[in-house]
Amino acid sequence: MQKYLKEARSLLALGIPVIIAQFSQTAMGVVDTVMAGSVSATDMSAVAVGTSIWLPVILFGYGLLLALTPIIAQMNGSGRRNLIASQTQQGFWLAIFLSIIIIAILYNSKFLIDRQHNIDPILAEKAVGFIHAIMWGAPGYLFYQVLRNQCEGLSKTKPGMVISFLGLLINIPINYIFIYGKFGAPALGGVGCGVATASVYWVMFLLMRWYVKRASSQRDIRPKHRFAAPEWHILKRISALGLPIAMAVFFEITLFAIVALLISPLGVTAVAGHQIAQNFSSLMFMFPISLAAATTIRVGYNLGKKSIENARISAYTGIMVGLVFACLTATFSIILREPIALMYNDNPEVITMASHLMLFAALYQLSDAIQVVGAGVLRGYKDTRSIFYITFIAFWILGLPSGYILGLTDYIVPAMGPQGFWIGFIIGLTASAVMIFARISWTQKQPDEVILQHSTH
């Protein structure tokens, strides 16, 4: 028991800074929406539409680069710190390639937006302007993630916390300048949010680079050459590990986007209630996703030290701590569901709908904690392909079809509307949690030499 309590303290020491960093980055999006809304409803809607296209694309790149964390954590644990700099250099090359692809996709976003029926032309123009502004921040964001993953792989999570919080603070005045046209800048409205966010991402990268170059804990991690050509075998290994993570992230984001579209014909009350429940759930999601990052670091580090037993302790401690947090956030969601809904909207019908859906959201958080932290465990073991297959089956084969059948058809019960889709979420996430937990158990039953060979490959 003492081992698990000690591990829980180590996990929380790593995880709490990640939680603050995640909340800071999420808050940047909230600030953009609120400040754009102060100009006009059209500007706020343009930011929302633009963000719905920007997020899946950029988070795909984020997911791909997440592979660096377990790679670096295991090198750190095994005493091979001399190899870390080359992994980071190749991470930058991967970020460059990703940035080119992302900018090319986002540059052509006008075609996607114009395909939406009955969209207001001014709204479409502003949304495209927002995307064309924020896309130039993609390289800065991805470069920042490369260095953040290096730090987190070395069990240094506080730099990401501090710099993300500074990014949030810097975002507000830059938004003010470009939205309202202050200090000689043009008044860009919602498009100014894109300019500000892109600028902040570059500032965050430069701050993280400054830290990494001066941190005493990383003085021994220096590249042999200031410029290193792409090493295709390293890039291939990072991509092979990161692509399943990126696809899993993409599956989850697009699932929620498609459900929002399927609910949209059910009326304003249904859409607003669903949006409130989903938005609040996404805030609560910061807890398990941050603990998952900490668990990946601890599992990877212990495997690097060839300590199979400590890696197992890290894995189960991470899942248990995640469940404790989920029980707390679920209880909070149930008890305060009406006041929470009132923070978003004062329409009685919307509040009733949102409050009802928050009950489903509370159940959802328990399964979500297991599957998210469990995925972090599997990343630590470098078993990312299974995450890809499990999330695809759970979300797209089980969750979405069951939600559609319950929400919009009379095949099993009379059409339940948004509630049916939330039951679908619970089915999908529970299936994912069961399959991921089973995969962890199977992995840990393998012979020690097989686990170490796979995890250090």
Curated annotation (Swiss-Prot):
GO cellular component: plasma membrane
Location relative to the cell: Cell inner membrane
GO BP field: sodium ion transport; xenobiotic transmembrane transport
Signal sequence residues: none
Family: Belongs to the multi antimicrobial extrusion (MATE) (TC 2.A.66.1) family. MdtK subfamily.
Keywords (A to Z) from UniProt: Antiport, Cell inner membrane, Cell membrane, Ion transport, Membrane, Sodium, Sodium transport, Transmembrane, Transmembrane helix, Transport
Function: Multidrug efflux pump that functions probably as a Na(+)/drug antiporter.
Membrane topology reported for the UniProt record: Multi-pass membrane protein
rRNA-binding recorded as keyword: no
Protein name (Swiss-Prot/TrEMBL): Multidrug resistance protein MdtK
Chain ranges passing through the membrane: 11-31, 53-73, 93-113, 127-147, 160-180, 188-208, 243-263, 280-300, 316-336, 357-377, 387-407, 418-438
A Pfam family that the UniProt record links to this protein: MatE
GO molecular function terms attached to this record: antiporter activity; xenobiotic transmembrane transporter activity
Domain of life: Bacteria
PANTHER family (UniProt xref): FMN_FAD EXPORTER YEEO-RELATED, MULTIDRUG RESISTANCE PROTEIN NORM-RELATED
